[in-house]
Every structure is written in structure tokens, then in C-alpha cells.
Amino acid sequence: RGASTVDVIRAWGANRGVEVTGHELLIDGDAPITATRIRRLIAAGDVVAAAGELGRRFYVHGVVAPGRGEGTGMGFPTANIEVQADIQMPADGVYAGFARVGGEVWSAAINAGVPPMFADSAASARLEANLIGYHGDLYGREVSIAFDRMVRPSRSFESIDALIRAVEGDIAQIATDYGTTPVRIA
């Protein structure tokens, strides 16, 4: 990672008929913007800083799969999104963001990581999102999730009722900040 030089890569390319053109690294503050730096920001849950370095929001794609059913049972269904294992995911926590389904973008309350209240479940999700205002079946559909900001880190609650109140509060705040109706993009 980052151990080569433009000259070495240019020689490698020349042997394979590929022209290599080097460029200067972008600098933010006193450090270069690199993929490693961006991955570290994402891993720390700082999706706002990562977006600044990327020039866009950090997002992932996946397919909606059946989940544990706890969200639906508590009144806020979630889309459990299967993401490739090698994708850098943000720190465990609740995020405000957006979910794109087909040609529509919905505001979303997103949970990244294993929810602490259900950590013993064999089918614990890594990424689940409540698409605010969405009603319909998403199973098997491709969804893109864009992370806008962290709302709070993951934590355990003293009871299921306390968890429900917290999630309802998260969803209500995100709905207020981002809206409850989709935006058509296609």
C-alpha cells in the first residue's frame, strides 16, 4: 500500500502497454488525502469528514435480505442490506442518511454494526435502514445507502421500551431534518 513510486508504476505499465500518468496528491491541511486516510475516517464514524475528502457522501450498495424481524415487531421496519464483506463500513452506530431504491431517494435512519440489544442473535445485521415514509416490500432489491452524519454511537438500553423510545426519537429527528417523502432522481 502506497509503497511504490510513479516511476516504478510507469515502468510496470510500459511492460504491459499501459501508459501511466502521475499526479500530485491533494493536500488537506498538512496531510495528503489518501484512500487509507478516508477509510480511517469512515471506520471511526466520521462520515462528515470522509465526505469532505471524497467530495461526496460515503455510500454503499447492497441487496435487501430478510432480517430478524425485531424492527418490524417494534413498529419501525428496517431493510437489512447485505454488503460485500470487503467494503469499509462506518463505526457501529446510528446515522442519518439516504436510501436510493430505483429512481427514488428516501431519508433513512441507518444502523451500522451489530445492535447491542440483539448481539446474541446469530443473524445480527451489519447494516439496516428504516426508509422514512416508505411502505412496500424491498426483499431482493438493490439499495444504495448514503451516510450523511452520525446521530449516536451504538449502545445498550436498559429495556426494549427504552430502545423503542430512542429509535423513535432518532427517526423523528431525521424525519424533521430530512423529510418523509422521496425525491425522484430518474
Cite the ranges covered by each PLM segment.
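Classical nucleotidyltransferase
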Residues: R1-P77, Y134, S154-I171, Y178, ...
